[in-house]
């Protein structure tokens, strides 16, 4: 027998042989720590505080770092990293190959960051990896085939990146345990590998929003555990394989927006008992919907719109008691006989139905009364673009849950049912282009949630009902092309929300345009053409500061064009033709830079036609039928304007000369008397100067600017003109002279003085002095004198007017980031660190000025607001100045009248960031109507980023590409992507979601640090701007 001591010795020795030494484990753990630190060093931006804890070292200290999870202490390898979870940590840079050394890693989640570069093939060494989550980044390149080596993967999410190339077949051949595969929103191409049919454990499968082509492999029918399959938004063709219809476990199936065709098999839904959602929209399917659809009793959403389905709509839908949404629009369904509408009676059994879209088919005949018996949960009912006749069911008001009702483009006749007034939740009512008649029911005024009401192109008669003034949420009103008469109700213009459109054109309306129209400060379109309107064009139209389209032609309007229309800086189209207007064309119209279509023809205008602005190109204006006009550009072929006394030989010269001399003498005496009276009344110039800014006299400014000579004019706006001048021998200054004839200019002057009274910051334009006096004609005179900025505005550098300027003015990426940092520091001071919080309200490239050292200074505080507790406006003198900011830069909440806040400045700053990176103005003429600068950049980030970046910055990167080392090029590209994402983050629609100034400064400093050394000092020691 073996003695007990000997037995214990053998057991202890065996244990020592089997267990690794602690020093070995410590060495492996140290390797994990090094791999993590290498990953951190590869990042351009480390997420602010996200990786702040990653700076301690020692035995197992890395296990305490944020996002790092190590094995349990009781296990054999307690300090080995098993999870790295850094989702939504604001990380930017590349994924370091060193992560492939974390050999015990089971979960890697880097989703929702700003990572770029390619997926390192070294990740294939992670043999224990079960979850790989890299979604919502900017990762490029292809999916490495080596990923197939991670054979224990159960979830692979690479969605929402910029991946290209084909899907590796190795995913299907090797990853047998995969249950979730998400590759959507990339740029993947080629065919779907048939090997993916081997993933028999797959439950979630999403390849949508790619460029995949070819047929759907029949092998996908082998995915017996599949719950969700999404192949939508690709270029797939052919038919849906029959094997797919046998996936009895399937709960959601989408192939929308492809090029698929063929018919749905008769027994397609026979085994799909668990199917809840099917989306086959926008393809080329044809034939009938099989009655077997009733077998899929769990169906809640059916989307088969945008195909070529035809015949009678099956009654099988009515047996789907869980159905909530049914989209059949844009097909070839028809109702030849009244019985063909029987499916509506069947659908009354679907008590959960919320959406029914039958628009754009060949449905005809009269609507059955059973429509009024559909579910009261129905919120969306669309019947537009069919051939439906007869009356609208009188009890349609029973559908009390309706929020959207589309009846337009049919042949409905009769009157609008008064029961519509019971639809208290209705937000959109479209009934235009029918044959409806009678009066518009007063009950429409009960629809207080209504946003859009379009009843145009019918046969309505009578007056516009005054009850429309109850629609306090209305955004758009269309009543055109009817037989309406009477005046336009003034109450209509008390609906402050009306902003998209008012169209009352082509009726028989009479009377004048109410002065109250000026209340609609956010209105974009006003159509009142082809009526019998008379009287003058109201001056108050100038208060509609967002107006872009104004149509008043073919009326009986008289008087002159109010100069206040020149305040509509966003106006694009103005048509006043065929009226009885007279007088001179106001020069203020020439100041509307956006105006590209101006029709003043067939009126009685006289005098000289301007030659600048909208009048500088004959293609955009029409003035025929005005016999007494003269001047203008040569292309208009108008007679030359004659001097007043050119034909003096026809008049008795001596009597007129004596009379004129006497009159001038009298006027001169009166003028001197009035001037003396004003001076004695007002005394010396006002001493209400800003604290610390002594006043300067009018005569000093006249001398400083050479009498405000045109050669010293730097620019002009609606509130004032800016001149270059010298107050003493050495100091150049910029003198802003207020146009006090504009009533808002004085408010601008007051706002600017109040905002900058106690402000001191290196990135704010400094006020040298002010002038509040009278000029040499005895009129009030106000001016603000600033430090002169010799390098002009940022706008001049980003958008040079000539090629010569473009060659001379080039800002490289480092300089652009520095300027953005300067502006961010200015905003941070205004919002958080000044004597009192100030909102600038007009951040844009033309208000960012550059000094001789290219340091940026924020200027023009004419719209600024001072806040109490950061939110409440106390600068009431500017509250009546109308729309806040500049179109394109102004925050969306300002468009609906919300109060100014620091969030609005952040939005404008975000747009400025996008402008400075793309070189595009926010209102660039190349943008489609539905595409703004934000959407333009978002498309670029989901495609080729270089397509949206300023070409000059691309050239900077290409200079590095020509070198032997392309690492700087990659760093530049990553910083550009980072900047674009920052701009999008700052300009989010929800104000509270926008990035605060402190975080902006942190990110810009990090970007600037990563760019350091890439843009060296040029010869002579001057920076390459």
Swiss-Prot record:
SUPFAM superfamilies: L domain-like (SSF52058), Protein kinase-like (PK-like) (SSF56112), RNI-like (SSF52047)
UniProt modified residues of type Phosphothreonine: 688, 705
Enzyme class: transferase
Residues that hold ATP according to the record: 714-722, 736
Ranges of residues in domain Protein kinase: 708-979
Outcome recorded upon mutating residue 699 to A: Increased autophosphorylation
Record-linked PANTHER family: LEUCINE RICH REPEAT FAMILY PROTEIN, EXPRESSED, PROTEIN KINASE DOMAIN-CONTAINING PROTEIN
Organism of provenance: Oryza sativa subsp. indica (Rice)
Name of the protein: Receptor kinase-like protein Xa21
Residues in the signal sequence: 1-23
Modification Phosphoserine occurs at: 686, 689
């Amino acid at each position: 027998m073996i003695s007990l001591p000997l037995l214990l010795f053998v057991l202890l020795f065996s244990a020592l042989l089997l267990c690794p030494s602690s020093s070995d484990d410590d060495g492996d753990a140290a390797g994990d720590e090094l791999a993590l630190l290498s990953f951190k060093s590869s990042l351009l931006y480390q997420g602010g505080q996200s990786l702040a804890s990653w700076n301690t070292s020692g035995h197992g200290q890395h296990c305490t770092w944020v996002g790092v999870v190590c094995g349990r202490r009781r296990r054999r390898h307690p300090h080995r990293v098993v999870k790295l979870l850094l989702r939504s940590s604001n990380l930017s840079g590349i994924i370091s190959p060193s992560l492939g050394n974390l050999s015990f890693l089971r979960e890697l989640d880097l989703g929702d960051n700003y990572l770029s570069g390619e997926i390192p093939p070294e990740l294939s060494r992670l043999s224990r990896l079960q979850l790989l989550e890299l979604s919502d980044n900017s990762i490029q390149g292809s999916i490495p085939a080596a990923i197939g080596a991670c054979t224990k993967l159960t979830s692979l999410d690479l969605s929402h990146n910029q991946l290209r190339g084909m899907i590796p077949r190795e995913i299907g051949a090797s990853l047998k345990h995969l249950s979730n595969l998400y590759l959507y929103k990339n740029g993947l191409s080629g065919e779907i590998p048939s090997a993916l049919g081997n993933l028999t454990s797959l439950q979630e499968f999403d390849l949508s929003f790619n460029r995949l082509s070819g047929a759907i492999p029949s092998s996908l029918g082998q995915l017996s555990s599949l719950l969700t399959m999404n192949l939508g938004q690709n270029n797939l063709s052919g038919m849906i394989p029959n094997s797919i219809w046998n996936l009895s476990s399937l709960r959601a199936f989408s192939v929308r927006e492809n090029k698929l065709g063929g018919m749905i098999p008769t027994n397609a839904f026979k085994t799909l008992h668990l199917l809840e959602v099917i989306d086959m929209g926008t393809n080329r399917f044809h034939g009938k919907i099989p009655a077997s659809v009733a077998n899929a009793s769990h169906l809640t959403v059916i989307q088969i719109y945008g195909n070529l389905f035809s015949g009678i709509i099956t009654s099988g839908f009515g047996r789907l008691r869980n159905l909530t949404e049914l989209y059949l629009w844009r097909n070839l369904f028809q109702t030849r006989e009244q019985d063909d509408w029987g499916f509506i009676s069947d659908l009354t059994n679907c008590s959960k139905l919320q959406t029914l879209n039958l628009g754009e088919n060949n449905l005809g005949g009269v609507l059955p009364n059973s429509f009024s018996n559909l579910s009261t949960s129905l919120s969306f009912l669309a019947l537009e673009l069919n051939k439906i006749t007869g009356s609208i069911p009188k009890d349609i008001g029973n559908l009390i849950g309706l929020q959207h009702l589309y009846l337009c483009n049919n042949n409905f006749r009769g009157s609008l049912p008064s029961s519509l007034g019971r639809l208290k939740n209705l937000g959109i009512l479209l009934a235009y282009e029918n044959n409806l008649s009678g009066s518009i029911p007063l009950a429409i005024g009960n629809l207080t949630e209504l946003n859009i009401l379009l009843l145009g192109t019918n046969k309505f008669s009578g007056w516009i009902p005054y009850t429309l003034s109850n629609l306090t949420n209305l955004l758009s009103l269309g009543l055109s092309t009817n037989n309406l008469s009477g005046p336009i109700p003034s109450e209509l213009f008390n609906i402050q929300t009306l902003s998209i459109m008012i169209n009352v054109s082509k009726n028989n309306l009479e009377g004048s345009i109410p002065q109250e129209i000026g209340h609609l400060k956010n209105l974009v379109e006003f159509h009142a053409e082809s009526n019998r309107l008379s009287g003058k064009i109201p001056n108050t139209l100038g208060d509609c500061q967002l107006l872009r389209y104004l149509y008043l032609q073919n009326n009986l309007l008289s008087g002159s064009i109010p100069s206040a229309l020149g305040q509509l800086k966003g106006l694009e189209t103005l048509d006043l033709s065929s009226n009885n207007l007279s007088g001179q064309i106001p020069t203020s119209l020439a100041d509307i830079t956006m105006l590209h279509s101006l029709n003043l023809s067939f009126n009685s205008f006289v005098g000289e036609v301007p030659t600048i602005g909208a009048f500088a190109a004959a293609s955009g204006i029409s003035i025929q039928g005005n016999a007494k006009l003269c001047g203008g550009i040569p292309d208009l072929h108008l007679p030359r304007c004659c001097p007043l006394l050119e034909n003096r030989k026809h008049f008795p010269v001596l009597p007129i000369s004596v009379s004129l001399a006497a009159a001038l003498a009298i006027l001169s005496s009166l003028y001197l008397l009035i001037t003396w009276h004003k001076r004695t009344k007002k005394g010396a110039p006002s001493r209400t100067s800003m604290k610390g800014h002594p006043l300067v006299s009018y005569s000093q400014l006249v001398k400083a600017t050479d009498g405000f000579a045109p050669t010293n004019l730097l620019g002009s706006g609606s509130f004032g003109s800016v001149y270059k001048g010298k107050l003493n021998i050495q100091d150049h200054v910029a003198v802003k002279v207020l146009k006090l004839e504009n009533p808002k200019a004085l408010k601008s002057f007051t706002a600017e003085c109040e905002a900058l009274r106690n402000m001191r910051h290196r990135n704010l334009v400094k006020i040298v002095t002010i002038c509040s006096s009278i000029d040499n004609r005895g009129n009030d005179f106000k001016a603000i004198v600033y430090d002169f900025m010799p390098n002009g505005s940022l706008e001049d550098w980003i958008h040079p007017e000539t090629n010569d300027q473009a060659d001379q003015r080039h800002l490289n990426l480092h300089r652009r980031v520095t300027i953005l940092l300067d502006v961010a520091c200015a905003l941070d001071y205004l919002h958080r660190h000044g004597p009192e919080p100030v909102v600038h309200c007009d951040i844009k490239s033309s208000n960012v000025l550059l000094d001789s050292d290219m340091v940026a200074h924020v200027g023009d505080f004419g719209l600024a607001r001072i806040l109490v507790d950061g939110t409440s406006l106390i600068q009431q003198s500017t509250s009546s100045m109308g729309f806040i900011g500049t179109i394109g830069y102004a925050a969306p909440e300002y468009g609906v009248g919300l109060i100014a806040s620091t969030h609005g400045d952040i939005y404008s700053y975000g747009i400025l960031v996008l402008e400075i990176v793309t070189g595009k103005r926010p209102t660039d003429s190349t943008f489609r109507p539905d595409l703004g600068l934000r959407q333009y950049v978002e498309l670029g980030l989901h495609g080729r980023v270089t397509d949206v970046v300023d070409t000059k910055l691309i050239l900077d990167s290409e200079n590095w590409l020509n070198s032997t080392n392309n690492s700087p090029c990659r760093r530049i590209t990553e910083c550009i992507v980072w900047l674009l994402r920052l701009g999008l983050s700052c300009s989010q629609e929800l104000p509270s979601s926008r990035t605060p100034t402190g975080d902006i400064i942190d990110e810009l400093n990090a970007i600037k640090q990563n760019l350091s050394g890439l843009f060296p000092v040029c010869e002579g020691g001057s920076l390459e701007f």
